[in-house]
A protein has these predicted regions:
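Catalytic glycan-binding domains that act on GlcNAc-containing polysaccharides
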Residues: 1-152
Length: 152
């Protein structure tokens, strides 16, 4: 996610106001930290340690979210497009297909489609480089649900 969001640039800032390595919106960071990031406090989101901590917490939150349920494809879509948009897309698209690749291509947001494809590709490239198994790639290739499992 970090590679796609900021290309490892700690000072990255989006036009929408997302900040830091994980490109966290201040409202999302505040929800994860249970404190607000307003005004000058928003600049704390450029601190790599805090940004990674909150970004990792948000990824874990999304993986457990009822709309995602451990599905790494849905997690990436929710990270970029938001859980609310993902819920709408799921209701609309899953009526037509359960194939994960068709789901990606059917999402109405080009930005989210591209994000999901790049994040998953990067995830599998890193897993391959470290000699790790890629059950989520195998699942998607077989048209099945790609459930994330930590290797730690």
């Amino acid at each position: 996610v970090m590679r796609q969001e900021s290309a490892f640039n700690t000072r990255a800032k989006s036009h929408a106001g997302a900040r830091g390595l994980m490109q966290l919106m201040p409202s999302t960071a505040g929800y994860m930290a249970r404190k607000r990031f307003r005004g000058g406090r928003r600049n704390k989101l450029y601190e790599p340690g805090l940004n990674l901590q909150l970004g990792q917490k948000y990824l874990g939150y999304l993986l457990q979210h009822e709309t995602v349920n451990g599905n790494i494809l849905m997690m990436a879509a929710a990270y970029n497009g938001g859980p609310g948009n993902l819920a709408k897309w799921r209701r609309r698209i899953l009526k037509l297909t359960s194939d994960p690749l068709l789901f990606i291509e059917s999402m109405p947001s080009r930005e989210t489609r591209d994000f999901v494809e790049r994040v998953l590709s990067n995830f599998w490239i890193y897993r391959d480089r470290f000699g790790q198994k890629m059950p989520t790639l195998d699942a998607i290739a077989a048209g099945k649900t790609p459930i994330y499992k930590s290797i730690d």
